[in-house]
């Protein structure tokens, strides 16, 4: 993991088209601004992990249940 120090209003670039800016620092909370192309999905990690888990559940759907749905 690369660890960088930034102060309020300082930025860093990820690749050529993603800019991360430190907006505010209050105690142990840091507000971050992101500029990225619209085709780049940005999620908080905890939400991203939930999405992955739901996708795994959907991919392992009960075959018997699916078969009964399609026979209707």
Swiss-Prot record:
> Which GO cellular component terms, listed alphabetically, does the Swiss-Prot or TrEMBL entry include?
cytosol
GO BP: bacterial-type flagellum organization; mRNA catabolic process; negative regulation of translational initiation; regulation of bacterial-type flagellum assembly; regulation of carbohydrate metabolic process
**Where is the protein localized?**
Cytoplasm
A molecular-function term among this protein's GO annotations: mRNA 5'-UTR binding
List UniProt keywords, sorted A-Z.
Answer: Bacterial flagellum biogenesis, Cytoplasm, Repressor, RNA-binding, Translation regulation
What's the domain of life for this entry?
A: Bacteria
Show the PANTHER family listed in the entry: CARBON STORAGE REGULATOR
Family as reported in the entry's similarity comment: Belongs to the CsrA/RsmA family.
What does the annotation say about its assembly with partners? Homodimer; the beta-strands of each monomer intercalate to form a hydrophobic core, while the alpha-helices form wings that extend away from the core.
HAMAP family to which the protein is assigned, alphabetical: CsrA
What is known about what this protein does? A translational regulator that binds mRNA to regulate translation initiation and/or mRNA stability. Usually binds in the 5'-UTR at or near the Shine-Dalgarno sequence preventing ribosome-binding, thus repressing translation. Its main target seems to be the major flagellin gene, while its function is anatagonized by FliW.
Annotated protein name in UniProt: Translational regulator CsrA
